[in-house]
Amino acid sequence: FSKNPLISKDLSYYLPPAIDAFLGSDSVTATLWAFQEQKPFLLVDIGTNGEILLVEENKITATSCAAGPAFEGKTLSRKITGSVTVDTLSKMIEGGIIDRTGLILDGANYGESTEDVKGFLNQEDVRQLQLAKAAIRAGIETLIKESQLSINKINNCIICGNFGNAL
């Protein structure tokens, strides 16, 4: 940092350690930042890995899941960003192109509002996104079950990370 003219020489900084191989220091930092939230709360960092932390008054429990590649567009037929993927999927659902199970309907009426998304995601892309969402949900449900909390007792769910910020 010392050679970068945009960073003050008097700046103090701290790079926290990772919690584990799949729970990085970004999750530590986000949890510390959010610690003033009313507990219990969930912090979900959707990045390369899906990192999920349940923060209670006297305990933090964490897990990770393989959600990042689909939301980052790495496993999809078109290499597009996660936020564009989610936006496209949303438009396809709203337009009746995808049914409640995630099946892309043959002969769906694309109409004006959804014509721009026609063919943008294929069936395998939709399935990859469903698997990623399911991995995050399973992580959340596991943390809540292990903590013996009711989902209704969770005060907040903070979505963070680069992808979370784009949502």
Where are these regions (language model features)?
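Glycine-rich phosphate-binding loop of actin/hexokinase-like ATP-binding domains
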Residues: F1-L6, Y13-A18, F22, T29-V84
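Generic secondary-structure signature for well-ordered alpha-helical cores
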Residues: Q36-K39, N58, S90-I98, E141-L149
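Gly/charged contiguous loops adjacent to phosphate- or pyrophosphate-bearing nucleotide/cofactor binding elements
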Residues: V86-A132
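Catalytic cores of large soluble enzymes that bind and process phosphate-bearing ligands
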Residues: I19-L23, I80-T81, F120-A135
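Generic long, charged, amphipathic alpha-helical segments
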Residues: K118, L143, N165-L167
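Glycine-rich phosphate-binding loops at beta-strand->alpha-helix junctions
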Residues: I154-L167
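Phosphate/ATP-binding catalytic cores across multiple sugar-kinase/actin-like superfamilies
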Residues: S27-A34, Q130-N152
